[in-house]
């Protein structure tokens, strides 16, 4: 990911304030509600029949935290995302057969949740930097597919 020094500093500063459990659960939950076809990868999560069921589902929240923790690893290794996400890319491609477009969708949902969580502190400039980051992470996760 090509960020200027001030962009990288701003991304890292905001990330240090992110509650991985709260933001991760919200982001994954929204992905499953807004793009319901993504639910097919989460059959073992139980009731995903309504938005309220998805957003209140403890397995969604727990997996969302796990996803956001991995995303945070990427935030701290922006210069080496392909290596950082190599194993996850292989898992999602070879074993789980996840459509790589879902990584882009989740990244965009994450940006929405960050904007919601941080309000005015999530400036247009910071959003632009995070859009670069989520695009880079999505590309790294899709790398095994190429």
Curated annotation (Swiss-Prot):
Keyword Acetylation attributed: yes
PTM annotation (N-acetylvaline): residues: 1
Domain Globin: 2-146
Residues the record lists as Asymmetric dimethylarginine modifications: 104
MF term (GO), any: organic acid binding
Source organism superkingdom: Eukaryota
A Pfam family that the UniProt record links to this protein: Globin
Expression sites by tissue: Red blood cells.
Residues with N6-succinyllysine modification: 17, 59
Keywords of the record: Acetylation, Heme, Iron, Metal-binding, Methylation, Oxygen transport, Phosphoprotein, Transport
UniProt modified residues of type Phosphothreonine: 123
Residue(s) carrying Phosphoserine: 44
Entries under InterPro entries matching the protein: Globin, Globin-like_sf, Globin/Proto, Hemoglobin_b, Hemoglobin_oxygen_transport
One GO term of the biological process aspect: hydrogen peroxide catabolic process
Residues reported in the UniProt entry to bind heme b: 63, 92
Keyword match Phosphoprotein: yes
Gene Ontology annotations for the cellular component aspect, listed alphabetically: blood microparticle; haptoglobin-hemoglobin complex; hemoglobin complex
Family membership: Belongs to the globin family.
Subunit structure: Heterotetramer of two alpha chains and two beta chains.
Function: Involved in oxygen transport from the lung to the various peripheral tissues.
Protein name, entry field: Hemoglobin subunit beta-2
Organism name: Tapirus terrestris (Lowland tapir)
């Amino acid at each position: 990911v090509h960020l200027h020094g001030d962009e990288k500093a701003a991304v890292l500063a905001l990330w240090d304030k992110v509650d991985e459990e709260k933001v991760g659960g919200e982001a994954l939950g929204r992905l499953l509600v807004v793009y319901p076809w993504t639910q097919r990868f989460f059959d073992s999560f139980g009731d995903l029949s309504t938005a309220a069921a998805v957003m209140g589902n403890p397995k969604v929240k727990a997996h969302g935290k796990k996803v956001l923790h991995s995303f945070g690893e990427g935030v701290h290794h922006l210069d080496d995302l392909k290596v950082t996400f190599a194993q996850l890319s292989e898992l999602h491609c070879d074993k789980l057969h996840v459509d790589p477009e879902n990584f882009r969708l989740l990244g965009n949902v994450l940006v929405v949740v960050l904007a919601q969580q941080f309000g005015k502190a999530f400036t247009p400039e910071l959003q632009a930097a995070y859009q670069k980051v989520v695009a880079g992470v999505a590309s790294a996760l899709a790398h095994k597919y190429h």
